[in-house]
Amino acid sequence: ADFSDDRITECQEAFELFDRSAEGKVFLGQVGDILRALGQNPTNGDVTKVLGNPPKEELATKQVSFSEFLPMLAQIERQTEHGSYEDFVEGLRVFDKENNGKIMGAELRHVLSTLGEKMSEEEVEESLLQGQQDPNGCIHYEEFSKYLLEG
């Protein structure tokens, strides 16, 4: 992932907050906290995986530099993006009564305006217009999810 200069500065500042020794390194055990400070929400399993599955004792002894940390952040961000699409589609699949990849526009309207991060009526209508309902008032939810998450 290519980070903007602003994002790199933001990451550097967060990294330095955890760098107790001022040597430009942090302990493996701090990486998860830095990722979370930067707005990510990885599971402990995700963090362990991105660290290369180190033995537990290395978490408090082995260190990483900022240049080693950035690719870890990029990997977690990629996972998050991928996960959210899968999660979204999975959540909408519940409403796919006929198992044909489509849900009723009315149901989708209800879901978007009442669950999770609620959207305003205008946002819902605009999103549904982009989702192109078929003549039966159904929307292909996988395509719609891609549209919605890619903005």
UniProtKB/Swiss-Prot annotation:
GO cellular component: myosin II complex
Descriptive protein name: Myosin catalytic light chain, smooth muscle
UniProt keywords, alphabetically: Acetylation, Motor protein, Muscle protein, Myosin, Repeat
GO molecular function: calcium ion binding
Organism per entry: Halocynthia roretzi
Location of the EF-hand domain: 6-41, 83-118, 119-151
Modified residues (N-acetylalanine): 1
Function of the protein: In molluscan muscle, calcium regulation is associated with myosin rather than with actin. Muscle myosin contains two types of light chains: the catalytic light chain, essential for ATPase activity, and the regulatory light chain, a calcium-binding protein responsible for Ca(2+) dependent binding and Ca(2+) dependent Mg-ATPase activity.
